[in-house]
Amino acid sequence: MSNLSGFIKRLRDIMRNDAGINGDAQRIEQIAWLLFLKVYATKEADWEWEDENYQSIIPEPCRWENWAAQKNGKEMTGDKLLDFVNNTLFPTLKNLPVDADTPIRKAIVQTTFADANNYMKDGVLLRQVINTIDELHLDDYEESHAFGEIYETILKELQSAGTAGEFYTPRAVTDFMARMIRPKIGERMADFACGTGGFLTSWL
């Protein structure tokens, strides 16, 4: 992804026109759950390729490719999209059957949506946001690695990391600290105040 700032600006400009979005914290949460589903769909495609018996924890109607992915102008939008997201997608993902034996890569869906919210009230604008995110090609090596920077870029672009409950440490600082620590293969590292994972990324 060559222009993360431009990508975030497009999303921000669309969401600014939605009456349901009130402040940067809500913008971040709205973008986050949509990005999660887009990335998860890409990962599931990999898992299905690796294991022909793989079964998604997400019911078919709620999988990204079946409700969010662009379909030559035939995708859901407007009130129909809002009704689906609010009354089908969220209730379904919040109440996925998860127990101690559920693999983490499946349980993470329910965990992610347990406290998530759809703040957008305009289904047409929501469709525009979804289409913008759907344009990401996360199967591309460079773009999938750039995804790790998207959340940090959101915080910087919205200019309110602190008030949104997240504090961003510049990449130059995390890289410098990793060089000073000089991590070695076999060592363990923990960031007990992990936010966007910048220190962990630099460690790797």
Q: Where is each model-derived feature located?
A:
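Conserved class I S-adenosyl-L-methionine
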Residues: 186-193
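Conserved SAM-binding loop of SAM-dependent methyltransferases across substrates and taxa
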Residues: 196-204
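Non-catalytic, mostly N-terminal accessory regions of nucleic-acid modification and defense proteins
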Residues: 1-185
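Short, small-residue-rich loop/turn micro-motifs
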Residues: 154, 194-196
